[in-house]
A protein has these predicted regions:
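Membrane-embedded helix-loop-helix hairpins and adjacent transmembrane boundary segments
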Residues: 1-477
Length: 477
C-alpha cells in the first residue's frame, strides 16, 4: 500500500486537472472552440500538447523496460519516431494548418472530403469509421494501463483505477473541450519531461556510475552496440522499427494540433520545442533502462516485470512526496493520450456524422453538448472493453498505430501536395490499405514485418498508379 504522501500528491494532481476543465468551461462558447480551440492555441502549448498526446505510457514504461531487458534492440523504433516527428512538423504541419482553415475543416475526415470535392461524403464516412474503431480500442488500452497503475501504485482495485483515471479525463474533456485537453497535455508534457531527466540522473549515481552499470550490463550480456545482434535477416526488424515513423502523418490526435495553432508562421517555433522535447525524452527513457540495470541487477527485484523499472527506481530512490510527483508523470503519459483520442473520436461523431445526418440548422450550444455526450458514450464503450485486466487490448496499440499510419499517412501527404487528386482514387486506396493492415496482421506476417510498412507502400503506389493512368478521370471542382 502506498504512503499517504503519494495519495495526497495524486489527489492534488487529479483535482488540478479537473480545475483546468472547469476554467475552460466558460471559454468554450462555440462549436469550433470546443473542437479546435478557435484556432487560437499558442506555439508552446501546441508543441508540448502534441508530444504529450503522442508518446503515451510507452515512453516511461515500455521503452525503459525493453532497454533493461535487451539493450538497444528498440533503437530502430526510437530513430523512426524521432525522424517521423521531425518530418511531420516540417512537411505536414504548415500545409495542414493553412489548408484546413481555407476549407473551414474541423476534423481530418472533413478536410480530406472537402478538399477532394467528395460531395457524397464517402471519404468522410469511411475515415470516420476507421477513426472511431481504432480510437475506441486505443482509448481502452490506455484505461487498462491506468487501472493497472492505480492498482500497483496505490493498491486501488483495478476497476476503480480505470474509473478514477478515466473519470478525471472525462471531467476536463467534457467541460473544457479542446482547450482543456491542450492545456492539461501541456502541463503533463512538462511533468513527463521533468521525470525523464530526474530519474536516470539519480539512478546513475545509485547504480555506481559508469563502472557499476557497465559491470552489471556485462553480467547480463547486454550491449549498447546497435549492430551486435544485426544480421542480414534482421533487415525486416530494422525496416519495421524505422517504419513506425511513417505513422505520424496519419495520427489524427497528433496532427489535429497543427490545425489549431494561432498562426502557421509560429509552427517553426513549435517544431523546435517539440524536437528538443522528443530528443531528450527518448534519450532519457533509454537512460532509465540502462541505469536501471545497475540499480536492479536481477529482474526478480522488480517482480519479474521489466516494464516497471521506472516505477521501482522511483520507489527506491526518492522520498514519498517526490515519488508522488514522479508517479503522476507516469499517469500523465497515459492520460494525455487518452483525452486526445476521446476528443478526436467525439469530434468525429459530431462533425462527420451528426452534423450531416441531422439536416436542420444547428446552434453552437447544441453542437457543443452533442460533442460532450459523445465523449461520455465513447468513454463508456472504452471502459467496458477495459474492465478485464487481462484484456488483450494492449496488444492492439501497435495495430491501431498501423491502421492510422497505413490508411491515413499517404492520403494526408497526397491530399496536401498533389493537385487535382480524385476523391475516388483516395477512397479506393484507403480501402486497399485497410484490407492490407488487417490481412497482414491476421495472417501472422506482422511477426516478420510491421503491417504498417506494406500498407503505407501499397497505399502510396495505389494512389500514384490510379492517378497516373487517370483511372477515374479528372476530379470535378
Amino acid at each position: 500500500m502506498a504512503s499517504y504522501e503519494i495519495f495526497i500528491t495524486f489527489g492534488i494532481y487529479l483535482v488540478f486537472l479537473m480545475a483546468i476543465g472547469v476554467y475552460f468551461y466558460s471559454k468554450t462558447t462555440t462549436h469550433e472552440s470546443y473542437v479546435l480551440g478557435d484556432r487560437g492555441v499558442g506555439y508552446w502549448v501546441t508543441a508540448m500538447s502534441a508530444q504529450a498526446s503522442d508518446m503515451s505510457g510507452w515512453l516511461l514504461l515500455g521503452l525503459p523496460g525493453a532497454v533493461y531487458t535487451s539493450g538497444l534492440t528498440e533503437i530502430w523504433v526510437v530513430i523512426g519516431l524521432a525522424l517521423g516527428t521531425y518530418l511531420n512538423w516540417k512537411f505536414v504541419a504548415p500545409a495542414l494548418r493553412v489548408q484546413t482553415e481555407k476549407y473551414n475543416s474541423l476534423t481530418v475526415p472533413s478536410f480530406i472530403s472537402q478538399k477532394l470535392n467528395d460531395k457524397k461524403g464517402y471519404i468522410r464516412t469511411f475515415s470516420a469509421i476507421v477513426i472511431l474503431f481504432f480510437f475506441t480500442i486505443y482509448s481502452a488500452s490506455g484505461l487498462v494501463a491506468s487501472g493497472k497503475l492505480f492498482d500497483s501504485l496505490l493498491g486501488i482495485d483495478y476497476k476503480w483505477g480505470v474509473l478514477i483515471g478515466g473519470g478525471t479525463i472525462i471531467v476536463y474533456t467534457f467541460l473544457g473541450g479542446y482547450l482543456a485537453t491542450c492545456w492539461t497535455d501541456f502541463f503533463q508534457g512538462c511533468l513527463m519531461f521533468f521525470a525523464i531527466i530526474v530519474v536516470p540522473v539519480a539512478a546513475y549515481y545509485s547504480g555506481g556510475g559508469i563502472d557499476g552499470i557497465s559491470t552489471a550490463m556485462e553480467a547480463k550480456d547486454i550491449s549498447l552496440n546497435i549492430f551486435k545482434y544485426t544480421k542480414v535477416w534482421s533487415l525486416p526488424i530494422i525496416i519495421s522499427g524505422l517504419g513506425w515513423g511513417l505513422g505520424y502523418f496519419g495520427q489524427p490526435h497528433i496532427i489535429v494540433r497543427f490545425m489549431s495553432i494561432d498562426s502557421a508562421d509560429e509552427l517553426w517555433k513549435s517544431r523546435l520545442i517539440a524536437m528538443i522535447w522528443v530528443f531528450i525524452s527518448l534519450l532519457g527513457a533509454i537512460a532509465v533502462g540502462i541505469t536501471g540495470i545497475g540499480v536492479f541487477t536481477d529482474i526478480s527485484q522488480m517482480g519479474g516485470d521489466a516494464e516497471k523499472v521506472f516505477i521501482f527506481l522511483i520507489h527506491k530512490l526518492f522520498n514519498p512526496w517526490m515519488a508522488g510527483i514522479l508517479f503522476a508523470a507516469i499517469l500523465s503519459a497515459i492520460m494525455s493520450t487518452i483525452s486526445s483520442q476521446l476528443l478526436v473520436s467525439s469530434n468525429t461523431l459530431t462533425e462527420d456524422f451528426y452534423k450531416h445526418i441531422v439536416k436542420r440548422e444547428k446552434t453552437h450550444k447544441e453542437m457543443i453538448w452533442v460533442g460532450r455526450l459523445c465523449v461520455i458514450v465513447i468513454f463508456i464503450i472504452a471502459s467496458v472493453l477495459a474492465m478485464n485486466p487481462s484484456s488483450k487490448v494492449l496488444e492492439l496499440v501497435s495495430y491501431a498505430w498501423a491502421g492510422f499510419g497505413g490508411v491515413f499517412s499517404p492520403v494526408i501527404l497526397f491530399t496536401l501536395y498533389k493537385k487535382d487528386l480524385h476523391w475516388k482514387t483516395v477512397l479506393v486506396s484507403m480501402i486497399i490499405a485497410t484490407i492490407t493492415v488487417i490481412t497482414w496482421k491476421t495472417s501472422g506476417l506482422s511477426n516478420t514485418l510491421y503491417e504498417m510498412v506494406p500498407a503505407f507502400v501499397i497505399n502510396s503506389i495505389s494512389i500514384y498508379l490510379l492517378e497516373k493512368f487517370k483511372v477515374f478521370g479528372n476530379n470535378e471542382k
